[in-house]
């Protein structure tokens, strides 16, 4: 029998809403981020996990630092980032909300302990 799961963002706590865990996803990572106005997210890359990521911006505006470049992001913008690129989100005056989806390029996803 086919199965589905539903999560409500307003019932998930924190700046990082752990959708993968809430929905029981096992093949890829997926989280919802809600950065308050002017906040900076974690600067990181995905070299250790070899994880390619896609960010779908759904509300607010801001910038995504990718290596030495900055990309203006906001509602309706979608960005893909290679694993080795260092990235850091920065929320604008309205805050910034996005969905992050990721999976390793070799296809062997291992859920992180934090998410």
Identify the role of each PLM range.
Residues 10, 88-115:
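Double-stranded beta-helix
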Residues 20-22, 42-48, 90-91, 111:
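Short histidine-centered beta-strand/loop micro-motifs
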Residues 68-84:
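Short acidic-glycine-tyrosine-enriched beta hairpin
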């Amino acid at each position: 029998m086919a199965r589905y799961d539903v999560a409500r963002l307003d019932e998930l706590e924190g700046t990082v809403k752990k959708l993968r865990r809430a929905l029981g996803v096992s093949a890829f990572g997926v989280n919802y981020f809600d950065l308050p106005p002017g906040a900076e997210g974690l600067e990181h890359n995905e070299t250790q996990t070899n994880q390619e990521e896609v960010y779908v911006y759904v509300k607010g505006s801001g910038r995504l630092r990718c290596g030495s470049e900055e990309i203006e992001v906001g509602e309706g913008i979608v960005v893909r980032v290679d694993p080795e690129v260092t990235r850091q989100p920065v929320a604008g005056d309205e805050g910034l909300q996005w969905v992050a989806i990721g999976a390793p390029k070799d296809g062997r996803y291992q859920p992180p302990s934090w998410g």
